[in-house]
Structures are given as structure tokens and as C-alpha cells.
Curated annotation (Swiss-Prot):
This is Sensor histidine kinase ZraS. GO terms for molecular function: ATP binding; phosphorelay sensor kinase activity. Its EC number is 2.7.13.3. Part of the Zra signaling pathway, an envelope stress response (ESR) system composed of the periplasmic accessory protein ZraP, the histidine kinase ZraS and the transcriptional regulator ZraR. The ZraPSR system contributes to antibiotic resistance and is important for membrane integrity in the presence of membrane-targeting biocides. ZraS is a member of the two-component regulatory system ZraS/ZraR. Functions as a membrane-associated sensor kinase that phosphorylates ZraR in response to high concentrations of Zn(2+) or Pb(2+) in the medium. Residues 36-194 are periplasmic. Residues 244-451 form the Histidine kinase domain.
């Protein structure tokens, strides 16, 4: 079962790592495809008009060429142009001289007027190749205009005739304008569809990213829950052990301590026997203290709740360690926060928590350093931070820092922070640690203003 659970956890972690990459890759590929295809419909609609315009221009040139060979009058050529301009979608069809004066126009009333000024004709500079542009007509409607030089003079094998000299001497330009509403509609449709698709892709991408972080958070919370369950199971085991150990060890310890004091009183002061008896008594006290701490860790915690002024409590707790801190030239810093609300807590237990953190900080600093305490309102509770300038905690030790019997010091039982964690938890709060090795540590407590009493057995 454990192997299967580990396999599922490994698969979940692998999927949580690889799925976002796959989704982002697919979304990116789809987005590139959408962007690459953008404008194809518009280009196709525009190409259709360009081909149609080219055919009409060549047809007019061909008709004019045949007409010149047959000495067709200008009125007949004008009629030919008007006939061709009747094609669907044609807004106007015109031939101008190099100054922009209209020679022929689909609207005969425009003949002799200026289609474009000489300056505009110089800018347009009609050549042998057809050129297109998007403009707005006089009525504000979009049109696609195609223009180039008007070349009705020659076809393959055709010789210039005398009556054609007037056409050769006067360069002319031909303009044909199509209704561009289809192109505009295609552009709007493509833009709208592209925006919808990109928005959908962005939504999928955002949902994937959020799901990734949510799932990682879920895995982490599940891991924390599993760790907490293991810790509680360990505490239960310690409770059973402590119940037996306390009875079996404390009675012999009392006898050993009594005998040690008896021998110390009987032995000559300063002698070896006297010193050994004192060592026995001290070790008996130390072992008794370890048993007491073990019992305190695992036994149900009874909280004597009352309204607590944190400013007063923190100042009082700092005074208790001030002498030890002064001896080591360690500064204790705390500025009272008048905006702090009173909280429901057990002042003795809370003082025990702070003292434990202070003493750990003093031991981590050794000599010459600073311990800073801050308190502030945080949501529906208060936050207390204890920061020291000590040697810090290694990254691989942070997760186990609240585990019973885990210690980074040569001395100590490793139960102090476990007791702190237990007391804070019984208050309905949380405790976190942040540290960089060699740069000190910060323990942050969060305690609710009003707590819900917990069943000590739970």
C-alpha cells in the first residue's frame, strides 16, 4: 500500500510538473497558427478585386486599341468605358492625363474635371505595374483603387498609325475603384474571430496556470497534513511511552537524588566524593527535567484563557531574559504598538512560548547581537515576530525544527520548539520560521483575537 501511495504521489508530482509545460506549448502553437492565418480571408477578397480590376483595365485597353484601328470616336470609347463600369462592385472607372484631368469617366459628367491634382498625380506616379490602395470615397465609403499607365497603343505585331499620334504624345493613367466593403467586413470578421480565439487561448492559459498553482498548493497542503498526522502519531506514541517512563523513572530518580545528597553531606567538602555526589544530583535533576518536558509535550494542555495585553506581556517576557542578554551584550528591541487589540490567551503559556524563543535566540547569537520583537494586527488576529542576528538555521533543517527531540545544539533535549508549537496550536494559531544560514532567523506567530476552545484530547 505504501509503495502504491508513493507511486501515486510521484505520478502526481510528475504530472503537475509536465502538464503545464505541455498546455503552454499547445496554446503557444495554436496562437502562432492563428496569428499566421490572420489576414488570409482579407487577402483573398483583395486579390479577387485586383484580378478583376486587371482584367477590366486590359479589356478597356484592348477595346481602345481596336477602336483606334477602326478610327472609333472618343464618344464611342467613352460608351465602352461606361459599359465596363457597369460590372458589379465598380464604383468608378476613369482615364486621366498626366495632370489628373479626366479624359474618360464612368460618369460622363466628370469628363474634363480633375480626378486628382497634378501634385497628387506626381505622388501616385502611375507606372507600367498596377498599384492598389485603400481610400475613402467622397461619400466616406471604403474603396479599393487600382491604377497604372493607360497603354492602349500596341499589341503584338501592331504598327503605329498616324491618327494614333495624339495618344502617344499625351501619357495617360487609368483608375478603377471597387467597393471595398467586403474587404472591410472580412477584416472585421477576422479581427473579431482572432480576438475571440486569442481570448479563449488566454483564458485556457490562465486557467492552466491557476490550476497548476492550485494543484501544487493542494499537494503541499496535503503533504503538510500528512506531516502533521505523522507528528501527532509520534506524539501519541510518546504519550504512551511517557506515561510508563514517568512512573518507572521518577521514583528511582528521587531515590538516586536523595542518596546523592546524603553522600554529598557526608563527604568532605571539596573532595572527590563530594564532587561526584553533586554530579549525580545534577544529572538526576536533568533527567527529571527531561521527563517533565516530555510529559508537558504529550499531556493535554489546559489553557487558562483571559484578556491579554500583548504589549505588557512582551515587555514582561523581555525583562525575564534581560539579565542574560546583557551579560552577553545582546540588545533587546521592542516598540509597543498601541493599535494592538487584546486577545484571548493563556498569559503563562504565551510567556513560556516567548521565553523559549528568546533563549534559543540568545544561544544562537552567543555574544554581541540583536533580538527584535514586533507585534502587529493581522486579519482576525495578531502577528508576533521574534528575529535574531544569530547563526541561522540550515535549509535542510527548517522542516524538522518543530519535531520532538530534533535539535541543532550540542546541548538540549530538542523538546523546546515542539512544546512551543503545541502551545501555539492549542491557541488556534500558527508558527512559522524563516532563516538563512549565517544570517539569523525569524519566528512568526499568528494568534487569533478570539479562539475557539479545542478539546485537549483532539
Amino acid at each position: 500500500m505504501r509503495f502504491m501511495q508513493r507511486s501515486k504521489d510521484s505520478l502526481a508530482k510528475w504530472l503537475s510538473a509536465i502538464l503545464p509545460v505541455v498546455i503552454v506549448g499547445l496554446v503557444g502553437l495554436f496562437a502562432v497558427t492563428v496569428i499566421r492565418d490572420y489576414g488570409r480571408e482579407t487577402a483573398a477578397a483583395r486579390q479577387t478585386l485586383l484580378e478583376k480590376g486587371s482584367v477590366l483595365i486590359r479589356a478597356l485597353e484592348s477595346g481602345s486599341r481596336v477602336g483606334m484601328g477602326m478610327r472609333m470616336h472618343h464618344a464611342q470609347q467613352q460608351a465602352l468605358l461606361e459599359e465596363m463600369a457597369g460590372q458589379p462592385g465598380v464604383r468608378w472607372f476613369a482615364v486621366t492625363d498626366e495632370q489628373g484631368t479626366i479624359v474618360m469617366h464612368s460618369n460622363s459628367g466628370m469628363v474634363g474635371k480633375q480626378l486628382y491634382s497634378p501634385q497628387e498625380m506626381q505622388q501616385l506616379h502611375p507606372g507600367d505595374e498596377e498599384v492598389w490602395r485603400r481610400i475613402d470615397s467622397a461619400d466616406g465609403e471604403p474603396v479599393l483603387e487600382i491604377y497604372r499607365q493607360f497603354q492602349p497603343m500596341f499589341a503584338a505585331g501592331m504598327h503605329r498609325m498616324r491618327h494614333m499620334q495624339q495618344y502617344a504624345a499625351t501619357p495617360q493613367a487609368i483608375f478603377i475603384a471597387f467597393d471595398a466593403s467586403n474587404i472591410v467586413s472580412a477584416e472585421d470578421r477576422e479581427q473579431r474571430n482572432t480576438l475571440i480565439i486569442l481570448f479563449a487561448l488566454a483564458t485556457v492559459l490562465l486557467a492552466s496556470v491557476l490550476s497548476f498553482f492550485w494543484y501544487r498548493r493542494y499537494l503541499r497542503s496535503r503533504q503538510l497534513l500528512q506531516d502533521e498526522m505523522k507528528r501527532k502519531e509520534k506524539l501519541v506514541a510518546l504519550g504512551h511511552l511517557a506515561a510508563g517512563v514517568a512512573h518507572e523513572i521518577r521514583n528511582p530518580l528521587s531515590s538516586i537524588k536523595g542518596l546523592a545528597k546524603y553522600f554529598a553531606e557526608r563527604a568532605p567538602a571539596g573532595g572527590e566524593a563530594h564532587q561526584l555526589a553533586q554530579v549525580m544530583a545534577k544529572e538526576a535533576d536533568r533527567l527529571n527535567r527531561v521527563v517533565s518536558e516530555l510529559l508537558e509535550l504529550v499531556k493535554p494542555t489546559h489553557l487558562a484563557l483571559q484578556a491579554v495585553d500583548l504589549n505588557t506581556l512582551i515587555n514582561h517576557s523581555l525583562q525575564l531574559v534581560s539579565q542574560d542578554a546583557n551579560c552577553r551584550e545582546i540588545q533587546l528591541r521592542f516598540t509597543a504598538n498601541d493599535t494592538l487589540p487584546e486577545i484571548q490567551a493563556d498569559p503563562d503559556r504565551l510567556t513560556q512560548v516567548l521565553l523559549n524563543l528568546y533563549l534559543n535566540a540568545i544561544q544562537a547569537i552567543g555574544q554581541h547581537g540583536v533580538i527584535s520583537v514586533t507585534a502587529s494586527e493581522s486579519g482576525a488576529g495578531v502577528k508576533i515576530s521574534v528575529t535574531d542576528s544569530g547563526k541561522g538555521i540550515a535549509a535542510d533543517q527548517l522542516e524538522a525544527i518543530f519535531t520532538p527531540y530534533f535539535t541543532t545544539k550540542a546541548e538540549g533535549t530538542g523538546l523546546g520548539l515542539a512544546v512551543v508549537h503545541n502551545i501555539v496550536e492549542q491557541h488556534g494559531g500558527t508558527i512559522q520560521v524563516a532563516s538563512l544560514e549565517g544570517k539569523g532567523a525569524r519566528f512568526t506567530l499568528w494568534l487569533p483575537v478570539n479562539i475557539t476552545r479545542k478539546d485537549p484530547q483532539g
